[in-house]
């Protein structure tokens, strides 16, 4: 049953906590909540949205699934607040478990997406979560069969129903970017011109770097046994674990449930903000000047322009000159005439993680001739003095290894920093194209 007073009381406490701990310039908090919906049987798929408010102002009561399961109604509510001076944005998360709901070409009522829908969605949802503990939502082997890394941290089950398969079509962001181009070609607007963040989804705001500092999620999901981090010998099983719905008794004994054992360490959201304040961070999120990592604290810059090849990485004003002459990640580049776009990609490793191996560009576009979207994988810089193969356009392996027993990785392979200026010599000015940068370690 829905307890209205309890709902308001909990929301009031959340806002009070956000205000108490917000310290501009040092530690930024937002008034925010999770809009949680779930489709009815037999689909039972779901994907949730984190709704973040820009300022200390917040509505008296958040819009919940008790109001509507329709995301368009959520956007209408957000638009109404915005007209009253209260800005917000929503971030869909865990699209990989949505069973194709996130990047479908139809509205909630089944009618085709149109321009009004596209404009409203982009106004309210400029970014999407691409990775978290319940798997990555970048791409899937069925969607990117030519990408040998497409199976990275794949969880094939639905969110909210781990026994059911989640349809990849409509659940992964690289395909979503392509669908957006196809919809724009059909003059229906582009609702999927999105930026990315990564998250943990542990519901405690804590990032886990290794097993020694794992703070878990809920209490019943925290122990190494339940998370599948270590085997579960029968002699160590307690009655509490035996009675937990995360453990099942079979002829072979006890084992950890699939939901927690498949969880990864989670991702991180990186935001290029002018200051550590609500206004600056919210502005960067809205402008999509963000990127995601799968957990490592990689530092990444990605710019595009008409002619960035004459800029010097060693110039003390290098970054400011790029902003003057180009656009940052998440932006549109409008070329003045039949020119080739140039890109600056600059990545630095996390000192506590593995060295960098390559910078890869995913190029996607709509082919008028074939009447379909396509994507190409292009390695633009390799570590260890290697060069991309002229035919495959991919770097050769640098033979770095990772031990499956100890997780130790090669420390004499890879680079602390990779950077390059890359020009797309095959660019067609008549075809709208997107570029996604990936850093491999």
Across the structure, where does each feature detected by a protein language model lie?
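C-terminal functional module detector
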Residues: 3, 7, 15-18, 37-38, ...
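A metal-dependent hydrolase metal-coordination microenvironment
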Residues: 1-86, 90-104
